[in-house]
Amino acid sequence: MKKKLSPRDRLWVFADPSLKELIISCELQLAQPITVENLRLLVQERLINNFERFSWIISSAGYTSRANNLDLTQHVTANEQIVIDPQRPLWQFNLVGNTKIEIGVHHALADGLSLVAILRKLTEEKPGVISRTKSRNKPSWSMVLRTIQGVFKALFTILFSPNVKMTNLETSKNYSATSWVRPDRLTNRTDFETILENLILDPALEIKENSIIAVPISISSLTNRINNGLGNKFALSPLPKKSQISIVDEFRTMKKQGEVLGAYFISVFIGLMPTYLGRYLSKFVSSHIFGIVSGVQVSKSVLKLLGAEIKQIKAWAPILGGQKFSITSVHYAGEVTLNQVIRS
């Protein structure tokens, strides 16, 4: 039986009708070897048995059907490449040399923060039973007004912001990736800010003074994500680039709550559109965004998977059509890993 995806998940199908490009990627480096058989058992127990979406087959129109006979040998592999097949559920784990786990999940199934929730579920020492919950908190009038204000502000930024030119809608496949691993404490932001500022100010990227940098903000805690079945629960809050102002400090000091919620509701609105209109609007929004800056704190302490210590975690987000760059910081065990992807 077919079901329609939630609007916030369907948006990512509109942005990638091929269901092959918008893949969130993650790598776990283990201190001790594990076997692919044990990894399959763990994925079955912790993920497939708890989250229905890991059995979903998603169509390019944004509908889901359940894979009745999920073949784990196709989704948890050993020494192969991550290849997302639209005819199967859109995820894969690949064990390389028994000590590195590569993970690929399509954005329609889960966003980056949900991927963190998946990692936390896989590394639980005593897995608990997941009970579906819904928040009963009623929004205040001030929150409603800030949200309405944020919707109009986000719409103005996306549709009418002056001096911001749309980039080429064609998605370039020729991009280079560079990774840094910095042993910085979580309280030290210097290197992250320096790299971010240098990247945004790089004249080769042709980022204008009025360009928009999109900062993903989670609107749901990890616990709520797990209890409510994962999925996309974040907003892209637009942040203008201004000279001689720290992008990071500006974002942290500005009152962004209404704008964040406004951007979230716009994404839900686009996800509710008919397919042809939703695809058009998603391309327009993504083409307006020149880059994505995100940061995820996974754990301050070391986690274990199947008894093996996780030494390092890397993660990166896909580049949407029209974007110039993407940079992701992963905070794990007191260190920061920066992954940067730039279009050539």
Regions found by a protein language model. Give the residues of each.
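Soluble acyl-CoA-dependent acyltransferase catalytic core bearing the H(X)4D motif
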Residues: 2-5, 27-41, 47, 54-322, ...
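Glycine-rich, often proline-containing surface loops adjacent to acidic residues and nearby aromatics
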Residues: 23, 98-100, 333-339
